[in-house]
Structures are given as structure tokens and as C-alpha cells.
Amino acid sequence: LGSGDAPKFVVIDSIQTMWSDSIESAPGTVSQVRGSAQALIRFAKASGAALLLVGHVTKDGQIAGPRVVEHMVDAVFSFEGDSAHAFRLLRAAKNRFGATDEVGVFEMTGGGLDEVPNPSGLFLADRDGAANPGAAVFAGVEGARPLLVEIQALVAPTTFGTPRRAVVGWEPSRLAMVLAVLEAHGGMKLGQYDVYLNVAGGLRIMEPAADLAAAAALISSLTGASLPRDAVYFGEIGLSGSVRAVAHAGLRLKEAAKLGFVRAFAPQSPRASGEPVNIAAQPIDNVAALVALIAASAVETRAGRAGPRPVMG
């Protein structure tokens, strides 16, 4: 790097394979990674070149090696995704020159990574044509970007002594809390049922605003009542059974309206701020109201289907 014209952009893949002759240790060790990173950063500052360091990550997505390297650089970005899905999420864990709540969505193609201009359309592209019980569309926000994704639930009678709880793409502890609230404040007896919850598309949801959508999918599966296909759900459920307002309500409603949804089941007064959105808001104050709303439509939507019936306490 020191010979010839100074480059404008330098990519090191990966920092764990670099070594310095002045450090008596093998490549990949803590001292070598730290020393190599320091030397490269000094070169970048002296030459004015932009430096991109590619590093290994652990199984839980954390940067492998010494944390001091993370403190030395200006920004830390990581890709999320798996081999079963074509999309990748680019998140910022650190950014000295901007916000860390932004997220980029890319699709892996034969020509490399392509930007996805409409991520919500990507995650909802494979929805079934007919309305089926146990599926609810969650109006979420990833960073500062609104994102609509389908949450799927299956509630089936258990064949073993202990009911099974399985969840993919959501926090298991969050599912356990929602189930407990549905039993305590919604009158739903779930102790004799296996519960499976899945976030379609392989996306992982972290925000508590998904509570209401997950609860709606669970109630829908248990009662056999299909949820309206033109509706979205969002809201945080408290231990008292109340549904609390969440941030970026206007952003969620605007994204839902853009994709053709006409109804939103959300806490009271979801349009706290922002420009008016052409979407009908259905206030949901507590889980008991949600259970009553879905159960009331069970007779119509369950016609011709056989499914488990709720046991009300």
C-alpha cells in the first residue's frame, strides 16, 4: 500500500488474516488483529483513503476478536440473513457520522446484492390468496424504515403431557408473556394446546409492537376465524392486558396504506402525529376487546372449516 499512488478505497478481507512482522504472534491472535488494524488506520488517515475492514463474526452475530478494534473504527455494519432466504439486512451497530437506527434491505441475485426498494412487498409477496386462520400482518419499523411482515401462528391440541411452545423469528419470552396475558385477561385457555409462531420470510422481529399482531394470529388460529386480509396490526401488550401505543404510528399506517391495506387494528389514537393517512383505524384498548372482536367473526370465517374451539374461562 505504501508504494505507488495512494489508493482512494481499500478493502481488507479479512482483518483476521493480516499480520505484522513487528509482532511475534500468529495471524488471527488478539495482538496481531489489534496491531494490524492500528497500522491500517494510520495509513488511511495519512493517505486520505477510505478503509473497509471485513471481519469474522461469531455464531450470535457479534464481531469476533478483540473489542478494541470495534472502538478504533468509525462505523460497524453487519449483514443479517441465512441461506434459506435471498434477502439480507444491513444494520449499523456503530456510526460516528450518522444514525444507527437505519436498516438496508438487499436481495442476493446472480449478479450480487441488489437493493430492495419495497421491502414490505418482498416479505408479503408469498401470501396465500385466500384468508386462512392464524395469519396476521404486522406493521413494523426496522430502524427508521417501515416494514410489513406476516406473523403466522398455529394452535393445536397437544398430544403429550406438556404443551410445546416453538417460535421462529421472535423472542420466546415475548411469546410466553402474550400467552399468559391471553389466558389471564382474554379468557383463552391454552394449557392443553401446542403453540407455534413463525415470522414469514425469515425476518427477526425485536420490537414489542408486534405483540398485538402475534396475539391476533394466536386467537385466530385457536378460534378458526380468519383475519381480514386488508388489515394490519401493531401495539404493545402490557401485563394488565392493556394495549399500549408505540412509536412511529403514522409511519406504519402510511406504509400499510401504500400497499393497499385499508384497516389498522392498533391502540387508541394511532395518528398522534404526521400527515393524514387514508386508512381506517380500529382502536383496540385491551386483549379482551381483541378476543371479542375475532370471536364475533368466527361463525362467518370458520364456515366449512373444522378447527379447535376456544375454552373461555
Region spans (language model):
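Peripheral, non-AAA+ core regions of ATP-driven protein-machinery
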Residues: L1-F9, I15-G313
